[in-house]
Amino acid sequence: MSRPEGGKADAKGTSNLESGHSYPLRETIESIVVAVLLAFLFRTFVGEAFIIPTGSMAPTLQGNHKDVTCVECGYPYQASASSENDDLSYQETVGATTCPLCRFTMPLDLDLDEERQRFGLPTDREESGRAAKTDANHESFSGDRILVSKFSYDLSNPRRWDVIVFKYPNNAKQNYIKRLIGLPGETVRVRHGDVLIKPAGENDFRIARKPPHKLVGMLQAVHDTHYRSPELAEVGWPSRWQPGIGDGAAGWRTVADDEKLELPQADGESWLRYRHLIPSGDAWFKLLDGDKSVIPQPGATGGQLISDFYAYNAFTTVRAERDHDSPVPTPSVLGTHWVGDLGLEAEVTTTGNTGELILELVEGGVHFQCRIDLATGEAKLVVVDERLQFVDDAGQAATASPKAATAVRGGRRHRLRFTNVDDELRLWVDDSLATFDGPTTYVSPEDCRPHWRPDDLGDLAPAGIATHGASAQIERLRILRDVYYVAVSAELRSDSEYTDGTSDLAAVQMFADPESWSTTNLFARRRSVDFPLGEDQFFPMGDNSPQSKDGRLWGDPPYVERELLTGKAVLVYWPHAWSGPFRLPIPNVSRMRLIR
């Protein structure tokens, strides 16, 4: 009978044999202990994972939410589900959401017919036509899972516009996540949607400008020609891109089933201008009932101002103890503040190697243009108003028309992005930021408000694209807006930015009444609020400003001490998995991203 090598039946051999068996076990135990210690050290000193519970940072980061795709225009977006709860005495379910592009209020795939009946919706989904079909992804999902770097601020100081995690000053056991706005020693002013900063020892405020990569990450979609509602087209709802009044843009036409815009001939400047022609919830109901009386005529007064609408906030709920909840969002979530800081994106192909391509944005009645020479690629910025001029950081007048070399050439296809945000003009060509030979910054007037005249639509047509001496085909157009920070504070005991408590409905109605913009005192009643900071004090705000409980509303103290900072949010590493028949734990890889 053979024995294992080294397996002698003596004390020494037995000891060696037992040692040979126990070593792997001991190694395993030691490895587990080391792994636990490393994980503990990593969590304590290097990084930690968090789940976002609320939507105060939406749409940058998602709290508890629903992922939906609009059944009318096909646009994918998220809506809050943070209000849902399991309290049987006060059950609440998100039953409908509103698309940020076409504004269709879409009933979700509710499990119970009685819940659909509370919305006045057909229980036979095939019969309803507009109700979302059975979709497992209409269930509620937990928030984004993010990774937070704990040592970032050991190596360098926190920077403005970072997304930070910290301990809530009034409850150090609770973690908060916001965007860092104010730094130690500064006074932060929130005014007209912008952030202004007064550094320690200085007397004047200056606007805080977002770095380019932060700006791109914070812009929110208002319109996209890739997402069109067939229903609106069928009933004759006017396109949001219209010839400008007196611009002679009759040459523009749609091609390829209205998917593209084309200008076959180009004599002089030929303009297309954006009009914010969005159907209200009531208009949608009437259109679906066959009532076309609500269809607007663009004319000189059709459309409205762009507001701080958040799809994340525009949801309606079904409550167990109520017989009926209106599926139409209330005015408070339709956006009650005018947003003048906008961006225009265009995918365009020009023919020939002469002429100009012109991009335009309007704010406060001032026309800001970027004119690109199709022969040389030179881009030139122009302010079509004598009231404003470009200035440097010291406030001194700068080059009247700064120029930049770009890769744009006639006969090629390019992706262009032109923004007017934080009193600064920027241009991207094929995702590359153009560098101008002078400052592209300016100072807005204190009383900046929307302007309109019959011969100059101003802020009623806040974006435009044109050719001069050239022809072009446009494959895609997008309108984007900046975050609007609402000027409220705990001391004011009001969630309204307007000093006289103007109703949400009154503000929304005024946005659609351009003939009254010059006489109304609505825009003069916008308040500003200040927040002074001391040494090692930081001021945070959420990107979802209307629904964010942040430094503005904490009361005392309205800031975060340095010792309460946990770290910098750097990565969304595990967005929720898409639900399906097998419910595999596979994350939505397309939404894994660095946090900007």
Predicted segment positions?
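Extended hydrophobic leader/signal-anchor segments used for secretion and membrane insertion
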Residues: 1-596
